Amino acid sequence: MSAERTLILVKPDGVSRGLVGEVVGRIERKGLKIVALELRTLERSVAETHYGEHASKPFFGELVEFITSGPLVALVAEGPRAVEALRGLIGATDPVKAAPGSLRGDFALEIGQNLIHGSDSPESAKREIDLFFPGLS
């Protein structure tokens, strides 16, 4: 099976709580390889592009404010069915509905600060990787 790539963001709440190592460790223990990793504070324009599909929703402004509020870690993981594997590892968007053992189930408390973002499809992964790591995909 060919390797697939996916983008993961450890959001500002995860960075400030010191959970980057936990996230990276779980990704690696899952059998995926990290091929790019960067600590950065997002510019508003990048955040607005990244979350563009939510632009008309009432929570868009709050989402952009949060994701640009402090440093985050952007990383690209690679392996067979990487998108699907990471979605399972991350857990449901709402931490209350996330399974125990998932990152959100274990470490997140509220939907607005849910620790981590993962691409939801191979197509989204390509678009997101191109935005965060131009030239990598």
UniProtKB/Swiss-Prot annotation:
Domain of life: Bacteria
CDD domains associated with the record: NDPk_I
Disulphide bridges, residue numbers: none
GO CC, alphabetical: cytoplasm
Single GO molecular function: ATP binding
InterPro entries, A to Z: NDK-like_dom, NDK-like_dom_sf, Nucleoside_diP_kinase, Nucleoside_diP_kinase_AS
Entry keyword set: ATP-binding, Cytoplasm, Kinase, Magnesium, Metal-binding, Nucleotide metabolism, Nucleotide-binding, Phosphoprotein, Transferase
Subcellular location: Cytoplasm
Catalytic residues, chain numbering: H117
Cofactors (names): Mg(2+)
Record field: catalytic activity: a 2'-deoxyribonucleoside 5'-diphosphate + ATP = a 2'-deoxyribonucleoside 5'-triphosphate + ADP; a ribonucleoside 5'-diphosphate + ATP = a ribonucleoside 5'-triphosphate + ADP
Oligomer and partners: Homotetramer.
Protein family according to the UniProt entry: Belongs to the NDK family.
Name of the protein this chain belongs to: Nucleoside diphosphate kinase
UniProt source species: Parafrankia sp. (strain EAN1pec)
Gene name in the database record: ndk
